[in-house]
Amino acid sequence: MACPGFLWALVISTCLEFSMAQTVTQSQPEMSVQEAETVTLSCTYDTSESDYYLFWYKQPPSRQMILVIRQEAYKQQNATENRFSVNFQKAAKSFSLKISDSQLGDAAMYFCAYRS
């Protein structure tokens, strides 16, 4: 049972990739934050490709997967979508999602994905 005022975000290590020999890893199995806090979810990946896309999806209790944000590897500017932003570090192969001013509706499982 969740406590009022707390958001539960499950982060499942997953590999939602569309090409072979690529790996995507998420390190946090579960997080909880209070409403209005900022939370950062981390993702690393391994690829030898130079042109690719990275995505963050969320799956709320309704079980419908929703695209939160995407980043093209050739763009140097980090993607931003309302309260969601990424910290994309191509050289370090790191792709973190930052959720600012978290809300109860943000409670979900979050998935990092790669596509070449």
Swiss-Prot record:
Domain Ig-like: 22-116
SUPFAM superfamilies for the chain: Immunoglobulin (SSF48726)
Ranges that cross the membrane: none
Domain of life: Eukaryota
Residues that carry a glycan: N78
Key word Membrane present: yes
Protein's name in the database: T cell receptor alpha variable 38-2/delta variable 8
Classification of source organism: Eukaryota, Metazoa, Chordata, Craniata, Vertebrata
